[in-house]
């Protein structure tokens, strides 16, 4: 059986050797060039492949069409991935006749994602394992071929646990590879209800929080001790790395019978530190520039004394809040995002918009700073605040379909030209930008689900001017990506899929046709006019509750471990798919059950209209728009939870309660 192998790390070498022993014809090996600055304690896949006289490659982008074609020409029967760090595209996964298989270092579906050996130790697990599974487009989500359990002892570190997993993986592969070769495997679907995702870890994640229990801190130390960068703390301005420790119970560590504050040094020989629960004896460690030594010698070298405190870097104890600049802060996303950020004391918000009705409730908050202004005029204010702030969100855009055909040049000027200035300022001042792309960039993509990394972006002919919004946003996406690749711009692109909820827009906007679909439908119900179904309302969309969407966006801004940097993330709810006609029916049901129903006119029915008469000749519609949310799940540990019926009811309730009572009465009388 012909095999192509994607491999890295010790497990990659184990996989190669197992394939050789099982009699596979290894056509090629793909691996990674070693990253500078990384501690390479593991064996080299490139060297192992060379010793087997197998062609070996380390492309920067293995999913590039050139490499896909080269793999296609080899016509593999099977593909194996052993700790390869890049997600393989569907184009590659579909090439082998018998499929693709991956070896993952956990008992799937738990601990999908990155660094599972480290994460199980951090979380205090007593068991982990290795899993051989079929590869699908979602990382670590395919059907299971087989898995083996690895027991975790209290003294295990990431290195010893990795050794156990390596031995277990070799045994598992020796058992399963012959069955794959003879095509005799049995597959078991993963239980999605048990799935968990974990992102990559960085050296900064080793910072010790002494408020945690001694057991939790010791778990962190075990997870990141040598050969990893180590768990660390600070004595004043000096960094202290802790390599090994042991948990001591409270009764044995009270100073003068009194429990000490977390982080307080209880004794120096042995070196014992108080924790949120119990205490920790530092067995070995070192100062940032010192040698590896015992805990007591470390205490002597650094001048530690009882009751001194370990903790965060002293100069950072009063850490400055993250400053977030929101341009378009009064808009639908802007005002909901402000509300979410203000619930977290770590953030300070600076906002600009041409009005303030939606954010009036925040104007007295000392962490919210608002200026009324226009992004096309207040260039100096914007540049100054880009320099001042940490995270930039330019949310200003014309984003209603009728405007794409009615005012295409204005759409281009605002959505592209004005936002390009902001992007360039972020590059100039080295600021992180979280940019609102759009589901519109996928255009008429024919994929079942729109994938950020693989789906084609398909738009219509030039005479269909509705696409000017889509291509303006797409070009900015590409410019931002290029600035990231060439100038080191830190960015995240997020693509909202039909977010709905209170304060979406206004009924006045709907009266001139410049609103979202649900607002237009609500206006029809409020005024007693027929609901217009453009081209019959068969178009399907996936509607996302604003609270679900904002929580995902908040996690992007939070950006734990930097894992959102350089990423494109769809934020939508693929389970809430409905046609516009179905949305209208759902809205009507909610409207008829609403306590204010009797204050509004009778329902005037549905009528079908052509898109050209409603939007203009330059319009072209899209049959469906369904997001893949694998990136959001993987990077944000996020999934939408709010059902569409709840979102529709809450959105309707908001609009009905904002209608002027006198106006509502007048509407009823007029229609009567």
Curated annotation (Swiss-Prot):
Site entry (Raises pKa of active site His), positions: 140
Any one Gene Ontology BP term: lipopolysaccharide biosynthetic process
Chain intervals for the UniProt region annotation (Dehydrogenase ArnADH): 320-672
Superkingdom to which the source organism belongs: Bacteria
Region (Formyltransferase ArnAFT): 1-310
Known catalytic reactions: UDP-alpha-D-glucuronate + NAD(+) = UDP-beta-L-threo-pentopyranos-4-ulose + CO2 + NADH; UDP-4-amino-4-deoxy-beta-L-arabinose + (6R)-10-formyltetrahydrofolate = UDP-4-deoxy-4-formamido-beta-L-arabinose + (6S)-5,6,7,8-tetrahydrofolate + H(+)
Keywords of this entry: Antibiotic resistance, Lipid A biosynthesis, Lipid biosynthesis, Lipid metabolism, Lipopolysaccharide biosynthesis, Multifunctional enzyme, NAD, Oxidoreductase, Transferase
Binding site for UDP-alpha-D-glucuronate: 399, 404, 438-439, 466, 498, 532-541, 619
Positions with a binding annotation for NAD(+): 353, 374-375
GO cellular component: membrane
Residues the UniProt record annotates as site (Transition state stabilizer): 102
Protein's pathway: Nucleotide-sugar biosynthesis; UDP-4-deoxy-4-formamido-beta-L-arabinose biosynthesis; UDP-4-deoxy-4-formamido-beta-L-arabinose from UDP-alpha-D-glucuronate: step 1/3; Nucleotide-sugar biosynthesis; UDP-4-deoxy-4-formamido-beta-L-arabinose biosynthesis; UDP-4-deoxy-4-formamido-beta-L-arabinose from UDP-alpha-D-glucuronate: step 3/3; Bacterial outer membrane biogenesis; lipopolysaccharide biosynthesis
Enzyme Commission identifier(s): 2.1.2.13, 1.1.1.305
Claim: Cytoplasm is one of the keywords in the record: no
Function: Bifunctional enzyme that catalyzes the oxidative decarboxylation of UDP-glucuronic acid (UDP-GlcUA) to UDP-4-keto-arabinose (UDP-Ara4O) and the addition of a formyl group to UDP-4-amino-4-deoxy-L-arabinose (UDP-L-Ara4N) to form UDP-L-4-formamido-arabinose (UDP-L-Ara4FN). The modified arabinose is attached to lipid A and is required for resistance to polymyxin and cationic antimicrobial peptides.
Known partners and oligomeric status: Homohexamer, formed by a dimer of trimers.
Family designation: In the N-terminal section; belongs to the Fmt family. UDP-L-Ara4N formyltransferase subfamily. In the C-terminal section; belongs to the NAD(P)-dependent epimerase/dehydratase family. UDP-glucuronic acid decarboxylase subfamily.
UniProt-recorded name of the protein: Bifunctional polymyxin resistance protein ArnA
Name of the encoding gene: arnA
């Amino acid at each position: 059986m012909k095999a192509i192998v994607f491999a890295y790390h010790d497990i990659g070498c184990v996989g190669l050797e197992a394939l050789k022993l099982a009699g596979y014809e290894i056509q090629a090996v793909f691996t990674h060039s070693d990253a500078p600055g990384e501690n390479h304690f593991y064996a080299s896949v490139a060297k192992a492949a060379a010793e087997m006289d197998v062609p070996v490659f380390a492309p920067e982008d293995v999913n590039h069409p050139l490499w896909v074609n080269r793999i296609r020409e080899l016509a593999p029967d099977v593909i194996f991935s052993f700790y390869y760090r890049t997600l393989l595209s569907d184009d590659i996964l579909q090439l082998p006749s018998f499929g693709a298989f991956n070896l993952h270092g956990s008992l799937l579906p738990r601990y999908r994602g990155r660094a599972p050996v480290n994460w199980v130790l951090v979380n205090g697990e007593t068991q982990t394992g290795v899993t051989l599974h079929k590869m699908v487009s979602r990382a670590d989500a395919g059907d299971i071929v087989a898995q083996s359990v690895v027991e975790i002892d209290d003294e295990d570190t990431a290195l010893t646990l990795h050794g156990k997993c390596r031995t277990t993986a070799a045994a598992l592969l020796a058992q399963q590879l012959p069955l794959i070769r003879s095509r005799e495997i049995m597959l078991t679907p993963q239980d999605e209800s048990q799935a968990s995702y974990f992102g990559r870890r960085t050296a900064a994640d080793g910072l010790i929080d002494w408020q945690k229990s001694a057991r939790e801190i010791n778990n962190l130390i075990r997870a990141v001790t040598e050969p990893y960068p180590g768990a660390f703390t600070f004595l004043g301005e000096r960094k202290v790395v802790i390599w090994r420790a042991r948990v001591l119970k409270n009764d044995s560590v009270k100073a003068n019978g009194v429990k000490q504050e977390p982080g307080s040094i209880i004794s120096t020989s042995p070196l014992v530190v108080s924790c949120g629960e119990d205490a920790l004896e530092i067995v070995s460690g070192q100062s940032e520039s010192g040698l590896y030594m015992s805990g007591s010698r470390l205490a002597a070298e650094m001048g530690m004394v009882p009751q001194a405190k370990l903790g965060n870097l002293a100069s950072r104890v009063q850490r400055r809040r993250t400053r977030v600049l929101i341009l378009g802060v009064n808009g639908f996303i802007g005002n909901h995002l402000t509300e979410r950020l203000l619930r977290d004391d770590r953030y300070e918000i600076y906002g600009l918009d041409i009005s303030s009705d939606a954010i009036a409730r925040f104007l007295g908050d000392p962490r919210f700073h608002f200026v009324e202004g226009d992004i096309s005029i207040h260039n100096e204010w914007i540049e100054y605040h880009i320099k001042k702030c940490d995270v930039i969100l330019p949310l200003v855009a014309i984003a209603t379909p009728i405007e794409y055909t009615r005012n295409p040049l204005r759409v281009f000027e605002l959505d592209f030209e004005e936002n390009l200035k902001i992007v360039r300022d972020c590059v100039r001042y080295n600021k992180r930008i979280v940019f609102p792309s759009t589901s519109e960039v996928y255009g008429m993509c024919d994929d079942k689900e729109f994938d950020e990394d693989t789906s084609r972006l398909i738009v219509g002919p030039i005479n269909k001017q509705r696409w000017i919004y889509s291509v303006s946003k797409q070009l900015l996406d590409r410019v931002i990506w290029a600035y990231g690749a060439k100038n080191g711009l830190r960015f995240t692109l997020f693509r909202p899929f039909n977010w709905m909820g209170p304060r979406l827009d206004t009924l006045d906007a709907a009266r001139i046709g410049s609103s979202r679909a649900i607002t237009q439908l609500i206006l029809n119900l409020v005024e007693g006019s027929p609901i217009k179904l453009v081209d019959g309302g068969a178009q399907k969309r996936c509607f996302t509750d604003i609270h679900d969407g904002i929580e995902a966006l908040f996690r992007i801004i939070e950006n734990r471990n930097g894992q959102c940097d350089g990423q494109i993330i769809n934020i939508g709810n693929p389970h809430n798919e409905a046609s516009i006609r179905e949305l209208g029916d759902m809205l009507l049901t909610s409207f008829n059950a609403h306590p204010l129903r009797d204050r509004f006119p009778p329902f005037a029915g549905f009528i079908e209209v052509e898109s050209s008469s409603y939007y203009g000749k330059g319009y072209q519609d899209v049959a469906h728009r369904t997001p893949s949310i694998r990136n959001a799940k993987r990077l944000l540990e996020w999934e939408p939870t709010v059902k569409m019926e709840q979102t529709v009811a809450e959105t309707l309730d908001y609009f009905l309660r904002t209608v002027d009572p006198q106006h509502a009465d007048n509407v009823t009388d007029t229609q009567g």
